[in-house]
Curated annotation (Swiss-Prot):
It is found in: Cytoplasm, Cytosol; Endoplasmic reticulum. GO terms for cellular component: cytosol; endoplasmic reticulum. Phosphoenolpyruvate carboxykinase activity is regulated by acetylation and glucose levels. The anaplerotic conversion of phosphoenolpyruvate to oxaloacetate is improved by PCK1 acetylation on Lys-91 (K91ac), Lys-473 (K473ac) and Lys-521 (K521ac). High glucose concentrations favor PCK1 anaplerotic activity by triggering acetylation on Lys-91 (K91ac). At low glucose levels, SIRT1-mediated deacetylation of Lys-91 promotes the cataplerotic conversion of oxaloacetate to phosphoenolpyruvate. The modification N6-acetyllysine is found at K70, K71, K91, K473, K521, K594. InterPro entries: PEP_carboxykin_GTP_CS (IPR018091), PEP_carboxykinase_C (IPR013035), PEP_carboxykinase_GTP (IPR008209), PEP_carboxykinase_GTP_C (IPR035077), PEP_carboxykinase_GTP_N (IPR035078), PEP_carboxykinase_N (IPR008210). Acetylated. Lysine acetylation by p300/EP300 is increased on high glucose conditions and promotes ubiquitination by UBR5, acetylation is enhanced in the presence of BAG6. Deacetylated by SIRT2. Deacetylated by SIRT1. Ubiquitination by UBR5 leads to proteasomal degradation. Its main location: cytoplasm. This is Phosphoenolpyruvate carboxykinase, cytosolic [GTP]. Pathway: Carbohydrate biosynthesis; gluconeogenesis. The keyword GTP-binding applies. It comes from Sus scrofa (Pig).
Length: 622
């Protein structure tokens, strides 16, 4: 007779590691009801130990899911099914009773600010996917903490998954294991249920031994029930539920209810030559150099940059009115292509050990390779592409997928900030918005006020390469770099940001906007970027201290020429870098106005509407 789970359900899942008795009652109920539904063969309660990790990695190696990279210490390569390589916005939904709780209702067409699904439609979708979806597989129970264990800003989640790749990655990206269950006790937690959607025996063979079910992929967030439910994809952004699903979509909704902010932002510490230190948070859309800025090697003598986090910030005002931030993650899930000793030497040092690479190319001597790695291959070394075939540059295809990743422990970063795990967080004195803007937008400007700064975040736009090559490059709206990650109505999100100014004793950070990517008429970058960006950080540092010369323009304060330290740089065309053209900004303001009126519509806060009109007025007087 099969063993019975203690709730009397006749279910044959065998607990192969840990015991159900050791789980807090609410966690046990979640595990048992999910096991009854998904019908795994085995249940494995993760303890997070090194021994467990090595066992899982060896098991995946035997199954052909990952390959050991012999050139490095404890590094692994996973190649996915080519249909499962990225987040899928069209299949990522928020479920609420009322559509308007999840997304603003646009004037016409579809909302670009998130996707809503009704509870009724979700129930049908859920019932068509999850019953029996883990047959023949092991259900892993992953207790994890977003943020340092015991920090008042941290939150706990329990993810159930049938993917050992998810377990190994979550051990890097979060604090995971028995200590989390001890800290949880009878406390609240976010529930995550994930399945690759490939019960055994398989109906059709896997590609690259990578389990996924692209036809039925769905990533659903139920904020009222504190649940995340993901089916059909093994890719990180869809399966590591602590990342975007919890840390941004779910957390932004919790933050709204509890009076804090969950943001798509890096956190860095900047120390000047006098030894004074200030922390900044920065929001850039993807492919704008967040990780590179977070791990920068400054070129200015005497300045130091240290990294608290490269992707997500949870921020809350303390009793003294300081905006305190933690990085809720424990690792970096970085885009590999473009990462090199030149662009990001600290990332290259971080990923030499204990790292899981996904969809990069492999060298014949057991190393990794990608576009922009800037290291010539040694004679006789061949490349295997991310598709698992020998790579030839004549094929005209990249050797690594453009969204290929490294998943690596933050503690290995040579410039990790000494306070990166401080339970109280670090005090944020400046917030930076930015995007990739080839024309019209200055290198840096400072917002006129908190309210104007919130408008600057709402107006963020960035160049994205259109999927269809013939379209060329388009400038996309990406407010707060959160467009794919809002957990609730963006109009209400703006009101929440504006409300921070009402916080008693709030020391509101200064808000800045940067653009490293302005080009001249011949298409050449006007600014060298990378380590030279410390010169812009130095000006912001001075501004936060009440120093640093600035002149007023219709869009905000830009540095006076003498205030930006350009020593040692070749012929920088300062006037071109900081030019604010009436013609460009008339068009820009019209486009922003149109977007906010159409997309946010009735939920646009009055204060943001008045900022648009004030900007138009200032431009008209140029």
């Amino acid at each position: 007779m099969p063993p019975q789970l203690s709730n009397g359900l006749n279910h044959s899942a065998k607990v192969v590691r840990g015991t159900l008795d050791s789980l807090p009652q609410a966690v046990r109920d979640f595990v048992e009801s999910s096991a009854k539904l998904c019908q795994p063969d085995q249940i494995h309660i993760c303890d997070g130990s090194e021994e467990e990790n090595q066992q899982l990695l060896s098991h995946m190696e035997e199954e052909g899911v990952i390959k050991r990279l012999k050139k490095y210490d404890n590094c692994w390569l996973a190649l996915t099914d080519p249909r499962d390589v990225a987040r899928i916005e069209s299949k990522t939904v928020i479920i609420t009773q009322e559509q308007r709780d999840a997304v603003p209702i646009p004037r016409s067409g579809l909302s670009q600010l998130g996707r809503w699904m009704s509870p009724e439609d979700f129930e049908k979708a859920f019932n068509a996917r999850f019953p029996g979806c883990m047959k023949g597989r092991t259900m892993y129970v992953i207790p994890f903490s977003m943020g340092p264990l015991g920090s008042p800003l941290s939150k706990i989640g329990i993810e159930l998954t049938d993917s050992p790749y998810v377990v190994a990655s979550m051990r890097i990206m979060t604090r995971m294991g028995s200590a989390v269950l001890d800290a949880l006790g009878a406390g609240e937690f976010i529930k995550g249920l994930h399945s690759v959607g490939c019960p055994l025996p398989l109906k059709k063979p896997l590609v690259n031994n990578w389990a996924c079910n692209p036809e039925l992929t769905l990533i659903a967030h139920l904020p009222d029930r504190r649940e995340i439910i993901s089916f059909g994809s093994g890719y990180g952004g869809n399966s590591l539920l602590g990342k975007k699903c919890f840390a941004l979509r779910m957390a932004s909704r919790l933050a709204k209810e509890e009076g804090w902010l969950a943001e798509h932002m890096l956190i860095l510490g900047v120390t000047n030559p006098e030894g004074q230190k200030k922390y900044f948070a920065a929001a850039f859309p993807s492919a704008c150099g967040k990780t590179n800025l977070a791990m920068m090697n400054p070129t200015l003598p005497g300045w130091k940059v240290e990294c608290v986090g490269d992707d997500i910030a949870w921020m809350k005002f303390d009793q003294q009115g300081n905006l305190r931030a933690i990085n809720p993650e424990n690792g970096f899930f970085g885009v590999a292509p473009g990462t090199s000793v030149k662009t990001n030497p600290n990332a290259i040092k971080t990923i030499q050990s204990n790292t899981i690479f996904t969809n990069v190319a492999e060298t014949s001597d057991g190393g990794v390779y990608w576009e922009g790695i800037d290291q010539p291959l040694a004679p006789g070394i061949k490349l295997t592409s991310w598709k698992g075939t020998e790579w030839d540059p004549k094929d005209g295809e990249p050797c690594a997928h453009p969204n290929s990743r490294f998943c690596t422990p933050a503690s290995q970063c040579p410039i990790i900030d000494p306070a990166w795990e401080a339970p109280e967080g670090v005090p944020i004195e400046g917030i930076i918005f930015g995007g990739r803007r080839p024309a019209g937008v200055p290198l840096v400007y400072e917002a006129l006020s908190w309210q104007h700064g919130v408008f600057v975040g709402a107006a963020m736009r960035s160049e994205a390469t259109a999927a269809a090559e013939h379209k060329g490059k388009v400038i996309m709206h990406d407010p707060f770099a959160m467009r794919p990650f809002f957990g609730y109505n963006f109009g209400k999100y703006l009101a929440h940001w504006l409300s921070m100014a009402q916080h008693p004793a709030a020391k509101l950070p200064k808000i800045f906007h940067v653009n490293w990517f302005r080009k001249d008429k011949d298409g050449r970058f006007l600014w060298p970027g990378f380590g030279e960006n410390c010169r812009v950080l130095a000006w912001m540092f001075d501004r936060v201290q009440g120093k640093g010369g600035a002149r007023l323009t219709p869009i905000g304060y830009v540095p006076e020429e003498a205030a930006l330290d350009l020593r040692g740089l070749e012929a920088i065309r300062v006037s071109e870098l900081f030019q604010v053209s009436k013609e460009f900004w008339e068009e820009e303001a019209d486009e922003i106005h149109k977007y906010l009126e159409e997309q946010v519509n009735a939920d646009l806060p009055y204060e943001i509407q008045s900022e648009v009109l004030a900007l138009k007025q200032r431009i008209s007087q140029m």
